[in-house]
Structures are given as C-alpha cells and as structure tokens.
Amino acid sequence: MGPLTVPPAGFAYVDANAFVYTVERIAPYRALLDPFWRDVRASGTSVVTSEMTLLEVLVQPLRQGDVLMESAFRAVLATSPDVHMVPIARAVLERAAALRAATNLKTPDAIHAATALIEGCTLFVTNDALFRRVPGLNVTVLRDLLPP
C-alpha cells in the first residue's frame, strides 16, 4: 500500500467520496486517509472542497434518517479548521461548463474539478479515475494506492 502524501505547497482538494470514507471509517481507505488527515493537521496544509460535497455526502444520511452521520458530515465540512468549503460561484460554473464540454465529466465532477483548478490545488484526492481527463489536475486515485 502506498502512502497518500500531503502536498509540500499549495492546497489539497478532497472529493466527496474521500469524505465519505473518512467519516464512515470505510476500510480499506481509512488506512490511507487517517495518516493523510494527521499530516494535514501537522503541516497546516489547507484542504479545499466544493460546497457540492455537502450535497453529495448528506444524501444517504438524510435518506436513512441517520441524524448522527448527518451531524458528523456537517461538523467535518463546516467546522473543521482543516477544511475550507468553496462556494459554487459563477466563475466555478463557467470553468465547469468548459471542462464538461472538453472532458465529458458529469456536472458535479466538473464543478469539483473547476473548484480545484480555480483554487490552485496541487493535489486532487478522489476514487474516480475519470478526473484524470482534466488537464492540469494532479489526481491521486485512492484505489491505486491499495495493494493488488
């Protein structure tokens, strides 16, 4: 298993699926993400994510009536000093439209990619290899770090 390394400079973008793995403590990804979050705290690196992440991670807890999980996601995204949620502004939507046209990403994914690029993120943590279609996005796919 390879490590998930915090960038030495810049911001790290964390996609919604990585927040789900973190909050729900899903193996085998927690073995990658727990040290990552410790390194983020120790290094003072800022983690960026789109407000779209809030929408994505709340669906299951709301559907299942899981108030504890809903609260856990809200706490991590809204009150963690390590995480900055970026609003979905017009500039993000314009960039996302261009990315969607060029790469055929789905709209939410295009919003995530556009946000990361606009914010100058030097690492994009996800479990979706389709983000590799985006020029200039330094994508780390979590499953690629797992042993075969």
Where are these regions (language model features)?
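Acidic, PIN/NYN-like endoribonuclease modules and their adjacent C-terminal/linker elements
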Residues: 1-7, 11, 85, 113-148
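Short, well-structured N-terminal submotif of metal-dependent ribonuclease cores
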Residues: 1-49, 62-75, 144-148
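Short beta-strand scaffold positions
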Residues: 14, 48-49, 87, 107, ...
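Alpha-helix capping/helix-boundary segments
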Residues: 18, 53-54, 92, 112, ...
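Short, flexible helix/strand-to-coil boundary loops that buttress conserved ligand/catalytic motifs
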Residues: 23, 61, 100, 135
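Acidic catalytic patch
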Residues: 25, 52, 80-101
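Short active-site oxyanion
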Residues: 42-47, 82-84, 120-123
